[in-house]
Amino acid sequence: GTVVVCSTGGGDGALDYESSFTLDGGILFAASAGNMAANPSSPNQPALSVGFGQTLEAGTYVQFKGDAYDFVFRLTGQASSAVFSAPELEGGAVCTVSYGGTYSGESARGLCSGGSYSGGTVLAELTLETGLTSYGQTGGMGGRGDMIGRGDRPEGPSGNGMTPGGDFSTGGAGGGE
């Protein structure tokens, strides 16, 4: 099957799951505007996780092109990162990721067909891994190893990773004055 989803904003990611997400067959395009973007934890086919380096507006086209495929998606909401996978992707092959430009065909729920893409900006030409290939800054939350960004919580005075260090009592962040 085909799944195309864009987050609705407010910091939410397009994908959200409890402990694991196995990707096995089908087409997936999941675009996230916030910093909660998650990747498939166990892809059984090549998958791409890309950060655009900026927030793309709704209506922007995103293209994934290789020798054996040409997928174009139209964002239905803002996005700063996206996850893409399809059975046509192969480890070791090159995928060119572009955004912007125009598309001459139809767009049904974000998936474009029956036309051609032109005039976009090339974001990257990536050699695909057999599992997940990541590119760019994607703004993920820390903690879960399957989330984009893979940041860690800072260690604070209490040492539990949840309490930041520093004095916040003078009207700065969380000061309340």
Identify the role of each PLM range.
Residues 1-177:
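A composition-driven surface/loop motif
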